[in-house]
Amino acid sequence: MIAASFLLNLLIYPFLINLFRKKSVGQYIRKEGPDLHGYKEGTPTMGGILFVLIGLLFGVLSKENGVILTGAFLFFLIGFLDDFLSIAKKNSTGLRAYQKALLQIAAASVVIAFSQPETAVDFFGIKLEMGAWYYLLALIVIVGSSNAMNLTDGLDGLAGWVYISGAIPYWFFLKEKGFSENIIILLSAGVLAFLIFNSKPARIFMGDTGSIALGGTLGVVSVLTKTEFYLIVFFPILVVETLSVILQILSFKLFKRRIFRMAPLHHHFELLSWEEEKIVAVFTIFNLISSLIALEVFGVIG
């Protein structure tokens, strides 16, 4: 099914790109973003609709955990709604920040309620009992993962390659621990096909439809497999990108000074005159090295 997911995405994307161009399903660029992105205005977006739906289809066929599929679908719907509103309003603003946050919290709450996870966590081999506080942690992990992937999706190929570089090693890690959550690898196959059309110059963007779904699914899987903290080492770039935004906001609010030229961090490097391809390569390699080290440390390889 992994190969089928890749091939199906590969075959359909050219038709989807042409369809979206004809229907003017294009990206609107944030005016406060780097001036270098102006040429991307109008590039077809919502490309995540294909690899997510195909991933979910094969997930159903492979009898994937129903709660995971439900969570993935809910976050897909949130991203789709955000993109749809942006296109309908003909600007870069879809859902307002508070609306998106409320929907993400609601989706995460549904997942937590139906999964009824145990309240102990695996902190890199140390079992910690958190009691009722665990539900807050689970909420933060799911919503945070969703937003982190969304923040990372700012350069051609960046979110896709970061996802691939962490998701495939993470999947092997889960298999070693006895879990059979295949949605991670099914989505990876679709994202790999998508990247053929998303690498610079991108012919299509995944949009929030793809990024919010990918991040949300990672968070849901980590909660159901009790590997919440392991996301940090398999997806350190998501953590770094998110922290750069938080630190930038706090620094400006408290000291009226910015730490970075622009946040998330990939925009900072853009404004330092790094080429997009270089940023994507460096971030992907960093994420991959961290993931491979994690596999060796946790006994999966080596």
From Swiss-Prot:
Q: What are the TM regions of this chain, as residue ranges?
A: 1-21, 42-62, 67-87, 101-121, 123-143, 154-174, 178-198, 204-224, 229-249, 279-299
Which GO terms label this protein's molecular function in UniProt?
metal ion binding; phospho-N-acetylmuramoyl-pentapeptide-transferase activity; UDP-N-acetylmuramoyl-L-alanyl-D-glutamyl-meso-2,6-diaminopimelyl-D-alanyl-D-alanine:undecaprenyl-phosphate transferase activity
Q: Organism's domain of life?
A: Bacteria
Annotated metabolic or biological route of this protein: Cell wall biogenesis; peptidoglycan biosynthesis
| Catalytic reactions on record | UDP-N-acetyl-alpha-D-muramoyl-L-alanyl-gamma-D-glutamyl-meso-2,6-diaminopimeloyl-D-alanyl-D-alanine + di-trans,octa-cis-undecaprenyl phosphate = di-trans,octa-cis-undecaprenyl diphospho-N-acetyl-alpha-D-muramoyl-L-alanyl-D-glutamyl-meso-2,6-diaminopimeloyl-D-alanyl-D-alanine + UMP
Chief location: membrane
Name a single GO biological process.
cell division
Q: How does it sit in the membrane?
A: Multi-pass membrane protein
Check the record and name the CDD domains matching this protein: GT_MraY (cd06852)
A GO term from the CC aspect = plasma membrane
Which Pfam family name is an example for this entry?
MraY_sig1
EC no. given is: 2.7.8.13
Cofactor(s) for this UniProt protein = Mg(2+)
Report the top EC class in one word.
Answer: transferase
Q: Where, per UniProt, does this protein localize?
A: Cell inner membrane
Tell me which UniProt keywords the record has, alphabetically. Cell cycle, Cell division, Cell inner membrane, Cell membrane, Cell shape, Cell wall biogenesis/degradation, Magnesium, Membrane, Metal-binding, Peptidoglycan synthesis, Transferase, Transmembrane, Transmembrane helix
**What is the protein's known function?**
Catalyzes the initial step of the lipid cycle reactions in the biosynthesis of the cell wall peptidoglycan: transfers peptidoglycan precursor phospho-MurNAc-pentapeptide from UDP-MurNAc-pentapeptide onto the lipid carrier undecaprenyl phosphate, yielding undecaprenyl-pyrophosphoryl-MurNAc-pentapeptide, known as lipid I.
Write out the similarity annotation. Belongs to the glycosyltransferase 4 family. MraY subfamily.
Name of the protein described by the UniProt record = Phospho-N-acetylmuramoyl-pentapeptide-transferase
Q: Which organism is it from?
A: Thermotoga neapolitana (strain ATCC 49049 / DSM 4359 / NBRC 107923 / NS-E)
